[in-house]
UniProtKB/Swiss-Prot annotation:
Family named by the database record: Belongs to the triosephosphate isomerase family.
Source taxonomy: Bacteria, Pseudomonadati, Chlamydiota, Chlamydiia, Chlamydiales
Protein residues bound to substrate: N10, W11, K12, G175, S215, G236, G237
Pathway(s) of this molecule: Carbohydrate biosynthesis; gluconeogenesis; Carbohydrate degradation; glycolysis; D-glyceraldehyde 3-phosphate from glycerone phosphate: step 1/1
Coiled coil: none
Catalytic residues as annotated in Swiss-Prot or TrEMBL: H99 (electrophile), E169 (proton acceptor)
Keyword terms of this UniProt record: Cytoplasm, Gluconeogenesis, Glycolysis, Isomerase
Family annotation (InterPro entries): Aldolase_TIM, TIM_sf, TrioseP_Isoase_bac/euk, Triosephosphate_isomerase, Triosephosphate_isomerase_AS
Gene Ontology biological process: gluconeogenesis; glyceraldehyde-3-phosphate biosynthetic process; glycerol catabolic process; glycolytic process
Catalytic activity entry: D-glyceraldehyde 3-phosphate = dihydroxyacetone phosphate
Native source species: Chlamydia felis (strain Fe/C-56) (Chlamydophila felis)
Gene label: tpiA
Name listed for the protein in its UniProt record: Triosephosphate isomerase
Amino acid sequence: MERKSYVFGNWKMHKTAEEAKDFLSVFCPFVKEISPASIVGIAPSFTTLSACCESIKKMDSSIWLGAQNVHQDSSGAFTGEVSLPMLQEFHVNFVLLGHSECRHIFHEEDSTIALKVGAAARSGVVPVLCIGETLETRESGTTKDVLSNQLILGLAQLPETASVIIAYEPVWAIGTGKVASTADVQEVHAFCREVLSRIFSKEKSETISILYGGSVKADNAEGFARCPDVDGLLVGGASLDPQVFANVVGNFNL
């Protein structure tokens, strides 16, 4: 079974509803014109999901809509949280889970992330499990140990037949302008696939898409596309401008 390719944009805490609609009015036609092999998606803030959902539907676009996080319970006394049923009202296709900013700023633990991954998968929303090492980890030579643990613990609640996407984002490369070499990225992705084969099976590991994120731009997207174990991109800052993001999508799909 051939792995699917994805290029997702993570808007983080950027764009109002009006700004999101303006973005999509420009970006959706770009995507239609490029007609990429990759599935293209955006993960806006919670407050812009409604506007994005409306715009995507209005323009009859194939763009996937994603969320940046979710609570593992469907309802309850969890002030400030958002549930999967709430996301599904906006036809959300995927949800980012375990992003390094959630891990390090908000102290999300692997056990909680695992519950979120399982809940998303059971609800029919594709979980995108984000993993990555810090600069300290990289320099200490323990990158593979950290990534292996994040995969094993983060996927502990995933139903056996459910779909999942992995996004490798080295923390030291997010928003820093530092970019991992294509050789380094391929080595890490191949290692992650090996870990996935131990968690599941060799056959299933070959069906799981692994995305790369970390200062991805239009001028390095094509290089990552040549890596056999890089199945897509998770794009941060370069996804905020419709023309720039379209160039990233186009270059990854040359």
